[in-house]
Amino acid sequence: MKESFYIEGMTCTACSSGIERSLGRKSFVKKIEVSLLNKSANIEFNENETNLDEIFKLIEKLGYSPKKTLAEEKKEFFSPNVKLALAVIFTLFVVYLSMGAMLSPSLLPESLLTINNHSNFLNACLQLIGTLIVMHLGRDFYIQGFKALWHRQPNMSSLIAIGTSAALISSLWQLYFVYTSQWSYGHYYFESVCVILMFVMVGKRIENVSKDKALDAMQALMKNAPKTALKMHNNQQIEVLVDSIVVGDILKVLPGSAIAVDGEIIEGEGELDESMLSGEALPVYKKVGDKVFSGTFNSHTSFLMKATQDNKNSTLSQIVEMIHNAQSSKAEISRLADKVSSVFVPSVIAIAILAFVVWLIIAPKPDFWWNFGIALEVFVSVLVISCPCALGLATPMSILVANQKASSLGLFFKDAKSLEKARLVNTIVFDKTGTLTNGKPVVKSVHSNIELLELLSLAGSIEKSSEHVIAKGIVEYAKEHNAPLKEMSEVKVKTGFGISAKTDYQGAKEVIKVGNSEFFNPINALEIQENGILVFVGRVISEKEDELLGAFVLEDLPKKGVKEHIAQIKKLGINTFLLSGDNRENVKKCALELGIDGYISNAKPQDKLNKIKELKEKGQIVMMVGDGLNDAPSLAMSDVAVVMAKGSDVSVQAADIVSFNNDIKSVYSAIKLSQATIKNIKENLFWAFCYNSVFIPLACGVLYKANIMLSPAIAGLAMSLSSVSVVLNSQRLRNFKIKDH
């Protein structure tokens, strides 16, 4: 069984990886992925051995709060921004008390002046009050940090909580000695505690704002979903909940309202904003017979539509599910960071303790409390400067921003692995009809042995009973030439060959057939030299003989810009193949015209499947690009499956990437975005590893002899800047652009 739920209380990747590690050890858990950014988890488990309630109890034992739905955040007395502003004000107050006299004695009243650069008792008490206020404002770090430590799952909050608590306890201890007059002054760390918490809070605020902006993509889509719709019942409009709509319901769509579910216009017309699907801002004109999709907006006039999908299976619901899965899943490249994070925090605590002991022993002055002060500063600096957040954010933040960018391009990735793997593709296999071509064959020429209008009337009358795209092309041509369409009887369809029906022909009831050459008994074929899709029209004379009445030559024209986009793809060093069930001449012509490297014609679904198998066995990483309707086996066999879709035609289950642009440019865009994303992730990881590799030893005091020591306050600033730099670098993906040539 697969379930998705939310987890509150996670602060860094050590939290998410700890939950994964703990639950992953259970025999009944098949797979679990926890997303720090989404505060969510996807789990697959054996329902015969456990249930979701038991899994929730296991997570609660680790110190986190699992929830089936993400409840609204509790309203606090202070908003995050006000809380941060207060933290900054009180931090400056404590720093002013601590260091004001060092800068200029006139800054402080005489009663608060320091003794030998050390705060007096009253000064220290005021610092303590300011520090306790700042600690209260940052209390979440202590609650979550010590809770995680108690459950043996230490995280970033644990490091901050331990470090600042140690500094506070040391300061209180020394304040006690001053109060009892055993010491004339003490060396306090109140300003260090405040500055550390302030910098961390600033960093977290910037981080959370950036996360929220990146998560806005799904929130914006959800806002497109109307809660109610106007249902027609006995010629009356009834407002109903969208969840109650079933296939076949007739709905009225008013100007300025959103489409509730996928459907088809049956009366009226409209102009729809489909930018949430395609990324194109221009409205799309829709008339009777056209499909409309959930989440799109009707700009002008009202119309009636028939629902073809319910809310659960609508286009918008599928897109939201894809975005959620993509944001919650993990890329393979993140596994390294997860492994490091699992041992990172315990290792940092061990290093901090070791550094404290070493400095206590080797400190150059014989005074114990001076040595203790140096050792404590090193201990706090090591804990505070280490940044598991930079490691944890390196991959998911880039994936999050990349998915947001993809949706603006009309692209949707199934999961992070799809986004990651697209850049590795070295062979692309294209379906032809509807993928490279318009998918709407048009009549190119007509060859007739009878009067032309009679031929058009016969063919159009029979083909109007078929839903095949070729049939629609012939019917459209007949209508354009004002051919009368007759009533048919005994209509029979032979899939893959053609259609037959009984109708009036030359004063008698005759069986007329329309289809490919294999549909007819041996006849004297017309000499047709043109390339194209051949459709014959004939009269049945006997069971063994048909009379040829004429033939249509149709062509399915390539989509605009396809040739240029394929040239772009080939410049990336990618091999291209065309697989089609069409005849050899048409497929060859299409391949040559578009500059495709190889082709296979007359290909049945099994032939396409075998070709992809063959390419993969040769070590190729294969992307299959199709329409998702009849390419499911080939799409499933490929390494990366791309479905070129228009609304509800999409088969999400078969796709790794869905393009609602229905444009080959999307394939190039997906590959380039994948490359840019992985490059961005590597930059983030490089910075995160380098930062921790360089700054942790510095905090330990390895350059003490060169007079370089990092104070706890500077360590806090460095840690905040580290995670913020990863977030800001990830945001650069927002500026990702595709060059046309």
Swiss-Prot record:
The keyword Manganese does not apply. One of its GO terms (biological process) is copper ion homeostasis. One of its GO terms (molecular function) is ATP hydrolysis activity. The lineage of its organism: Bacteria, Pseudomonadati, Campylobacterota, Epsilonproteobacteria, Campylobacterales. It comes from Helicobacter pylori (Campylobacter pylori). The chain crosses the membrane at residues 84-104, 125-144, 152-172, 191-211, 340-362, 376-393, 682-701, 713-731. The active site is at D431. This is Copper-transporting ATPase. Belongs to the cation transport ATPase (P-type) (TC 3.A.3) family. Type IB subfamily. Keywords: ATP-binding, Cell membrane, Copper, Copper transport, Ion transport, Magnesium, Membrane, Metal-binding, Nucleotide-binding, Phosphoprotein, Translocase, Transmembrane, Transmembrane helix, Transport. InterPro entries: ATPase_P-typ_cyto_dom_N (IPR023299), ATPase_P-typ_P_site (IPR018303), ATPase_P-typ_TM_dom_sf (IPR023298), ATPase_P-typ_transduc_dom_A_sf (IPR008250), HAD-like_sf (IPR036412), HAD_sf (IPR023214), Heavy-metal-associated_CS (IPR017969), HMA_dom (IPR006121). GO terms for cellular component: plasma membrane. It comes from the Bacteria.
